[in-house]
Amino acid sequence: WATDAYILPEIDLGGGYSVAYTDGEDSMDIDVELTRLADAVNSTNRALGMPAPAISFEPGRYIVAPAGVTLYRVGTIKHVHLSDAKDNGGMSDNIRPALYGADYTARLANRTGSAETMLARVCGMHCESGDIVVHEVQLPADLKRGDILAVPVTGAYGRTMASNYNQTLIPAVVAVSES
């Protein structure tokens, strides 16, 4: 079949290259992975006696995800099995945790918190049982109403999947370059 094969001038290796969304996750080494994929394509073409194609890929999430941080203002805090910190956002600005269980982390962003921590869940403002922004995270035990939580690595899908669910506004974007 190789003698009658169409010679592909270019092969797109696609996208979806992984990034670390939470502490303890490893980011993919994109140089190693893309080299491995390109070597596999080129060795297969050599074995079939075909010329090497131009190889492209789509690094969107790998570039954009770490570039976004979503800020939430803490509203109420309930101390139950684990502490629930209710924020002023939620599934309307990041549906991924509710839709398919995506996990994130959060950090106190507006001040230095106490050294003592509590296991917390960051919940959204919508009256939905699945409106959870962060399933479990260690936050300062002195977290209080008005504090700002930063949820990193939201650049890839947060804004593009956001909606006006329950007539909420889509959060503003602040673009920062270097310093």
Predicted regions and their residues:
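Active-site loop/helix belt of alpha/beta enzymes
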Residues: 1-78, 166
